Each structure stands twice: as C-alpha cells, then as structure tokens.
From Swiss-Prot:
F-type ATPases have 2 components, F(1) - the catalytic core - and F(0) - the membrane proton channel. F(1) has five subunits: alpha(3), beta(3), gamma(1), delta(1), epsilon(1). F(0) has three main subunits: a(1), b(2) and c(10-14). The alpha and beta chains form an alternating ring which encloses part of the gamma chain. F(1) is attached to F(0) by a central stalk formed by the gamma and epsilon chains, while a peripheral stalk is formed by the delta and b chains. InterPro entries: ATP_synth_csu_bac/chlpt, ATP_synth_F0_csu, ATP_synth_F0_csu_DDCD_BS, ATP_synth_F0_csu_sf, ATPase_proteolipid_c-like_dom, F/V-ATP_Csub_sf. It comes from Sulfurovum sp. (strain NBC37-1). This is ATP synthase subunit c. Keywords: ATP synthesis, Cell inner membrane, Cell membrane, CF(0), Hydrogen ion transport, Ion transport, Lipid-binding, Membrane, Transmembrane, Transmembrane helix, Transport. GO terms for cellular component: plasma membrane; proton-transporting ATP synthase complex; proton-transporting two-sector ATPase complex, proton-transporting domain.
Length: 101
C-alpha cells in the first residue's frame, strides 16, 4: 500500500510540473508583499525611536540640537536605505525573477 501511495505522489508531481512557473510567480508576489511590509514596519519603528531619542536629547541639552538633528538625518537616511533595498529586491523578484526560465 505504501508503494502505491508513493507512486501516486511521484506521478502527481509529474502531472503538475507545468504549473511550477505560475506557483513561483504567486509565491514571489506574496514574498514581495510580506517582505516589503515587514521592512516598512521595521523602518517606521526605527525612525520613531530615532526621532524620540533626538527630541529627548534636545530637551536635555538645547545647545546640541543642531548636531543631534544632523546625526538624526543621517540615521534616518540609513534606515530608509534598508527599506529601499527591500523594495529593489521585491521588484527583482516580481519582474526579473531568476527562478523563472
């Protein structure tokens, strides 16, 4: 009985082998959406913490406000760069997928 079950599983894989490309496309869309959503969420949390720390530092020592703002903008650019890198990877997965022949 086990041998027949394994045979049917093997034949099922052969029967549906032509649908592999559409499954890769579907999973690429899901992966791009989830990846970009998580990257945006992480970026938003990181930017919020950066802004809160800058505001707290400026409140403690107003004389350092300019230097803190400069450092904050550099940190925000680095955080946003991570989200942009995720967007580039998602666009590659959607439009130039290396797994689709």
């Amino acid at each position: 009985m086990k041998k027949f079950f394994l045979l049917f599983l093997a034949l099922g894989a052969v029967a549906f082998a032509g649908e592999g490309e559409s499954m890769i496309k579907a999973y690429s869309v899901v992966a791009a959406g989830v990846g970009l959503g998580l990257a945006a969420l992480g970026g938003a949390v990181g930017m919020g913490h950066t802004a809160a720390a800058t505001i707290a530092g400026t409140a403690r020592n107003p004389g350092l406000g300019g230097k803190l703002m400069t450092t904050m903008f550099i940190a925000l650019a680095m955080i946003e760069a991570q989200v942009i890198y995720t967007l580039v990877i998602a666009l590659i997965a959607l439009y130039a997928n290396p797994f689709i022949g």
